[in-house]
Amino acid sequence: LFIDEYYTTFNKPNVRLVNDPNGVVNITESGVEMASGDRHDVDVLIYATGFDSNHIPFPVTGRDGVTLADQYGANEANNWQMTRPQSLWGMHVENLPNFYLMIGPQSLNPVTNVTLLCEEQGKYIANLVARMRQEGVHEVEPKAEAVADWTARCNASADGKVWLRCNNWYMKSTKSDVEAGRERSQGMWMETYETYLQHVLGGAGGDQDTLLRFRA
């Protein structure tokens, strides 16, 4: 592990390690229910579902019944595999207020140092939540035009690069899809780590008030 304080965290009075072999069986209004029947109230729920990053294994439902699968083009016909990711910076998803992704689709170049990216995204999320608390804001989500703009930028980031010349995991649409005129979809940000941070932290594509919708 890269964090020296990881193990000592479990000794804090506000931390409890729950070891249930059968895991979580239900998400309740206030927290989670374990297979053992125990319930735990939580303020924040972090989904950690493994390394099959294309697969959406359970429904994540947002405003008006819209799901993460809907936003990412996953359905039963394609075995819930993500095909058309749409997001802002790979972190915010439209119609899913207060939902944050880390190293999600459309966020990183595949040769990026993931640890550093996680640190910067974590700082961004923490600072945004702190701002919301200070201003009395209860919900935040990206604007539709911001999502469309970032998706277009991700698509353009692969232009002139080898990724477009073959079928590969990083392109959610294949070379044959593009040649047939079907919707092009880019699963990764193919520019540099520095240019990504210029958007997230430096307002290169617009500031938070321009790109995000805040609700009291």
What are these regions (language model features)?
Residues 11, 39-40, 92-95:
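Extracellular/periplasmic catalytic domains that process cell-envelope and extracellular macromolecules
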Residues 39-41, 67, 171:
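Short, solvent-exposed loop/turn motifs
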Residues 44, 48-132:
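Glycine/threonine-rich phosphate-binding loop and adjacent beta-strand/alpha-helix elements that clamp
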Residues 86-87, 98-216:
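C-terminal, flexible cofactor-proximal segment of oxidoreductases
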Residues 18-20, 54, 70, 132-142:
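Acidic/polar loop patches that form or flank catalytic/metal-binding clefts of enzymes
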